[in-house]
Swiss-Prot record:
Compartmental location: Plastid, Chloroplast
A single BP term in Gene Ontology: translation
Cross-referenced Pfam families: Ribosomal_L20
Name of the protein described by the UniProt record: Large ribosomal subunit protein bL20c
Species: Pleurastrum terricola
Length: 115
């Protein structure tokens, strides 16, 4: 049986992992074994948090809409119900931006729905 020397392949693989973990704290950026574990963990965290980010932003938009709607005399639930009854299709991101940057349009939306 001939001897297999994997010098270049193994070195490239290890250098690739260490390049990814550059900037990690402690031995996670210098030792291959811990760096590999931390890199796999980091990828799992990033996948999980990409999904969580969508939930967090939707919740933030709802909080902002609710705050402005309560300021104008309705709560979030009533406001969204009135919008859907009036068949106005506008997403929550846009509604929250209207509440922050253009409160006159947002208040006109509320006044239209009350009638």
């Amino acid at each position: 049986m001939t001897r297999v020397k994997r010098g270049n392949v193994a070195r490239k693989r290890r250098k690739k992992i260490l390049k990814i973990t550059k900037g990690f704290r402690g031995s996670s950026s210098t030792l291959f074994r811990t760096a590999n574990q931390q890199q796999m963990k980091a990828l799992r965290y990033s996948y999980r948090d990409r999904l969580t980010r969508k939930r967090n932003f939707r919740a933030l938009w709802i909080v902002r809409i609710n705050a402005m709607a309560r300021h104008l005399g309705l709560n979030y639930n009533q406001f969204i119900n009135n919008i859907t009854k009036a068949q106005i299709i506008i997403n929550r991101k846009t509604l929250s931006q209207l509440a922050i940057y253009d409160s006159t349009i947002f208040s006109s939306l509320i006044s239209i729905k009350n009638n």
